[in-house]
């Protein structure tokens, strides 16, 4: 039996964010103070049994609860007094509780040396001041090895992606001189992803995959130009769903002892649908491709000198009502190892041709947005030295993915 309690607390406060702005007949003159404090507890029980004849059983329960104490206040920059809602600015103070119960059970079974199966099913209850729902999450993995070096894998997986804590607060922030507003969304719910995937490994090095996934309530921050005011609104919304079907091939190759390369090719069909996206619902589809190549050239073994060249290209894609242009980059690095390989000197240049940063745009119904973001070539040097046989202790990292 494993009984555990984990408690996490995080607090982050930002003070004195000042804005003076006049746009048409509207004037914004304030500074803000906002703070996020999260108290989170996690309890879990887990048990495993070996039943013999290749059968193993596991089950358990996980309970997670968090309390989000956050606020955002507006102040007069001259008097320092707190502004009220009558000043067209909304102060926000929240005490939001979230609870999740997850109960699961699974098994694994080996059928000789060629076939192995593991499966599990989790039922989860998610409760917030807005949502109270039950969901099911199945996982099935089947591995078949007809001969050494050849492996066929079939898998059904499922997962949940929770929104950031600050994204569900009923708060409004201003950027771009007040023309751009960042809106919270108290109605956000977790996204649920289900994926079916098949992978074939040939000669222990060539990898071929095909998959289909469906993400219900997929969420992402989107941009909308208001039809009522001269502002653009950034807000994280739940779409009806996102779907992807894809194929992938990963092919390594070597040229004697001086070149070691890997080419990865990906083809995707992508769909996103939202029937209540403001006043402009959408159902968009796009096919695109990705190619990536990693090359390591051994210039010399004595001294140990290697040159690494990597390249990446991504054809046109979509995200919500955004159109994402073609992008790519080429990186290069020169590595020198010495002192019996305890010391490594690395010189590198990233995004040589300054093509890595995309400038997404919107041309959809009433929306017309053009962005231009600059690309920068990066040069750097790093030095690493290993003292004796020191190995860094493995520690579980604190999950801060949902914090502001």
Label the predicted regions:
Residues 1-16:
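Single conserved hydrophobic/aromatic residue that forms the stacking wall/gate
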Residues 30-118, 143, 271-298:
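Outer-membrane beta-barrel transmembrane domain signature of Gram-negative proteins
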Residues 40-42, 92, 189, 195, ...:
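Outer membrane beta-barrel strand-and-loop segments of large Gram-negative receptors
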Residues 54-57, 113-117, 149-152, 204-208, ...:
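Repeated loop/turn-to-beta-strand initiation elements of outer-membrane beta-barrel proteins
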Residues 63-69, 121-129, 156-162, 204, ...:
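Transmembrane beta-strands of outer-membrane beta-barrel pores
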Residues 96, 160-209, 214, 232-246, ...:
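Outer-membrane beta-barrel signature, preferentially recognizing the C-terminal barrel domain
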Residues 97-145, 258-269, 290-315:
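Surface-exposed extracellular loop regions of Gram-negative outer-membrane beta-barrel proteins
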Residues 285-404:
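Conserved C-terminal beta-signal and adjacent last beta-strands/turns
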